[in-house]
Amino acid sequence: MESRLGWLTDLSTETGTNLRRTSIICTIGPKTNNPETLVELRKAGMNIVRMNFSHGSYEYHQSVIDNARKSEELYQGRPLAIALDTKGPEIRTGTTTNDVDYPIPPNHEMIFTTDDKYAKACDDKTMYVDYKNITKVIEAGRIIYVDDGVLSFEVLEVIDDNTLKVKSLNAGKICSHKGVNLPGTDVDLPALSEKDKSDLKFGVKNGVHMVFASFIRTAQDVLTIREVLGEQGKDIKIIVKIENQQGVNNFDDILKVTDGVMVARGDLGIEIPAPQVFAVQKKLIAKCNLAGKPVICATQMLESMTYNPRPTRAEVSDVGNAVLDGADCVMLSGETAKGNYPINAVKTMAETALIAEQAIPYIPTYDDLRNLTPKPTSTTETIAAASVSAVFEQKARALIVLSTTGDTPRLVAKYKPNVPIVMVTRNPRAARFSHLYRGVFPFVYDESSDSEWTVDVEKRINFGVKKAKEFGILVDGDTIVTIQGFAAGVGNSNTLRVLTV
């Protein structure tokens, strides 16, 4: 049997003619929100457009959607997915008097209050916090972070229902509208703010393909989002963002009801000790891999490329190790939203991911997934797992999967084949959200169904082979493995074949 260590000793660091299978998500901002730049991002490797609803108006986000769709008219390529990232429930400070920044020294004692009369009258003596229950959930000795941890305070005393006495642990400035984090404290904020609900309805109206749901703490939070999306948004994938200790603690229950996961390391690294973040990342990714649910690694992956043309070596290692951990997708934030080198950042991420994919010991990974997956599995999963085994044994160059809902490609992707998964579907939405699954190359087959099922199957397989040749996946003489159904309808994927192109 192939060993992990043996695999690494023979590792090639050349990209060669291999095709990257890890998807890349790009946050779109002022530097990239035009059709021409979006085309260049797609050519560089972008698969999913991310809109950050913590910033921008509906008019602006509408322009991102319109420009993304315009880019597909200018350059066909692979289908492009669009993701809506919610602002989520959060805690913020109030407005300082005259919007002035107030410097404070270390060991400075002051008051945090939920009294609304201070909402626009904060200073270096009293700071308003918009979380009414803060005095009920926190206790003396706890730490409060302000402005992503730039300022740290220790709670000295809970004075009454509205008031905390705190002491600064470092020097800094009191500013308006800064985020507040309560590490180690269970908060009871609602899953969705009114703004979030309005944003989700905007997403449904505009046909987004997935929602990145911020600050998810419980499984019920996911169900609440699904309820707001309603019947019209039933096909929108919900990707939970794990950003706090509660989300980590409740992860197993959350994983059962979500469509996928984002390990959002920014806020997570404030809510839990920073040295623990890498271990939590590995643990959550492993659980997602075993469950067959897509997982995204995000935040500060190539942060220095916001302003520099080359990444730090640590950043490149971070991207590569996220791929090795098992991430289906990696994400860029400020690098493509406001950065000076957005195209170069995507190219760097794409090349790094491609090399990292060659470092994965595929057969031992497959064996782990097969051995740890509870039995019996569904018929579709059994066929999916068998197809990946067939790829290894036949040294096939690709899998071609006929799918209606995208579920079979998801299950094939779970078992980490070392070749592309060519997905042929008549469902454009399924084609787009399938970018969440590592290795899936989706293509939309828009011909009408043939009355003879077997004829229709062969036409779609031939279409998949044709597209795979166009994209450099296959050449004549290659061996392929195909998955199809024995009859029309959802859930009938039960036939595996080995063919020669």
UniProtKB/Swiss-Prot annotation:
InterPro entries linked: Pyr_Knase, Pyrv/PenolPyrv_kinase-like_dom, Pyrv_kinase-like_dom_sf, Pyrv_Knase-like_insert_dom_sf, Pyrv_Knase_AS, Pyrv_Knase_brl, Pyrv_Knase_C, Pyrv_Knase_C_sf
From the UniProt record, list the reaction(s) this protein catalyses.
pyruvate + ATP = phosphoenolpyruvate + ADP + H(+)
SUPFAM superfamilies named in the record: Phosphoenolpyruvate/pyruvate domain, PK beta-barrel domain-like, PK C-terminal domain-like
Required co-factors: Mg(2+); K(+)
Q: Where does ATP bind?
A: N52, F53, S54, H55, R92, K178
Q: Which residues form a coiled coil?
A: none
Q: Name one GO molecular function term.
A: kinase activity
Give the similarity note.
Belongs to the pyruvate kinase family.
Note the subunit structure: Homotetramer.
Name the UniProt record assigns to this protein: Pyruvate kinase
Taxonomic classification:
Eukaryota, Fungi, Dikarya, Ascomycota, Saccharomycotina
